[in-house]
Amino acid sequence: VRPDTADTPQFSPRQNEVLEQALRLLVEGGDKALTTSGLARAASCSKESLYKWFGDRDGVLAAMIAYQASKVRTADRAGEKLTDQILKQNLEQFGRDLLEVLAGDVSLALNRLAIGQTSRDGSKLGKLLVEHGRRQIDRRAMALMEAGKRASLLRFENADAAYHTFYGLVVSDLHIRMLLGEPGLKDNSRQAERAVEAFLALHGVEQKTADALRVSAGR
């Protein structure tokens, strides 16, 4: 089971260290603290290396966002048959990771900064968050949904609609409330489990039915 991971960024360990420093600078000092000079000092690397790896400052921001999004995992079990239990585990893992990332200081800082920039240039940071963050997560999750449908474990007409139903069940209004200063959940695992239960009640296929569908499809 390996839903499409082509959109997942592949950073070297050293690049990951640099991105962690960039995230720390953003959380501790805000937008103005995140400069290529400041990041080079904090990460003990040259500005030339930063430009080589990430390009300009927008490239650093895009890499930071993609790095954060990569922490929301789906499946990575090459060659393993997708079963109802494995699908459930992968959905729960996705839900837990999503909640943990959204509730983190980095995500909240990035989103608040993007909101604060909405009146300037259409919020360049907001566009980066959508393209390198949310869409990356969406594509990987929808690949898992499609894998579940091919295995006759999920039933839906539109993967995008099914995924956004699941996303809404996981996140609800929690992200907005956290952006407004409320604390995150004490138990992300339980929230993810409840969301998966509700999603499978809507789109899951009972085991007997799934077996019959696989037989009829010759799988």
Question: For the regions a protein language model found, what residue spans apply to each?
Answer:
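Helical hydrophobic small-molecule/effector-binding pocket
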Residues: 66, 88-124, 171, 205-209
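Short, Lys/Arg-enriched anionic-surface-contact patches
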Residues: 8-14
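Short helix-capping/turn signature of helix-turn-helix
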Residues: 31, 54, 115-121, 132-133
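Amphipathic alpha-helical linker/stalk segments
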Residues: 65-94, 102, 144
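Hydrophobic/aromatic residues within well-ordered alpha-helical segments
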Residues: 14, 57, 64, 68, ...
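Helix-turn-helix
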Residues: 17, 21, 25-59, 63-67
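C-terminal peripheral helix-coil segments that are non-catalytic and often amphipathic
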Residues: 1-5, 93, 97, 139, ...
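Amphipathic alpha-helical packing segments from all-alpha helical-bundle domains
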Residues: 104-109, 113, 123-150, 160-164
